[in-house]
């Protein structure tokens, strides 16, 4: 990476450099009105439904489509807990493939007419629990130093994510005791 390659970048170039200090940073389109683009790396956070313990935390290089990150997250969960989960609840960004081996991927959708009231309530409760993950991510950013990474490179970012998840789990463990 030299100064001329940065200066000669065009608007439509694929692999642009957005930061001199962190060249692995990519542009992520969020679609928010006040901030349509963010610069950084994508994360994949997996946690349990009831206790809120983080089972997997991955920093993903580039800007991959959410649906393509499920395999890596499932592989990490299986390595950590020894078995693959039966149900994975995700947001609407994970549309596409619904089955990953023994794991079923559920995303929010309009209930079907054939669903009973019980099934509809069960689905609604599942997705309300999934929405709690946003609070977990917010806590990781504010209280566990994931808002800004002070370690260099992609490996430094991965280390930062894992350490933040470990610190969060320690706090949860202390609260559960």
Task: Identify the residue ranges that each predicted region occupies.
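Polybasic low-complexity intrinsically disordered regions
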Residues: 1-86, 92, 99
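Helix-centered, glycine/charged polyanion-binding patches within enzymatic domains
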Residues: 83-155
């Amino acid at each position: 990476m030299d100064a001329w390659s940065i200066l000669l970048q065009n608007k439509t170039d694929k692999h642009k450099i957005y930061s001199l200090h962190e060249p692995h940073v990519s542009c992520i389109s969020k679609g928010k009105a006040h901030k349509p683009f963010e610069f950084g790396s994508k994360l994949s956070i997996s946690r349990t439904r009831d206790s809120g313990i983080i089972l997997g935390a991955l920093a993903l290089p580039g800007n991959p489509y959410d649906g393509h990150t499920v395999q890596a997250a499932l592989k990490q969960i299986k390595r950590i807990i020894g078995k693959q989960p039966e149900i994975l609840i995700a947001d609407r960004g994970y549309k596409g493939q619904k089955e990953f081996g023994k794991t079923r991927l559920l995303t929010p959708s309009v209930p079907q007419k054939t669903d009973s009231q019980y099934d509809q309530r069960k689905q609604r409760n599942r997705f309300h629990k999934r929405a709690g993950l946003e609070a977990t991510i917010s806590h990781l950013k504010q209280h566990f130093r994931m808002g800004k990474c002070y370690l260099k490179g992609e490996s430094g970012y991965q280390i930062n994510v894992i350490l933040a998840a470990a610190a969060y789990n320690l706090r949860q463990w202390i609260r559960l005791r």
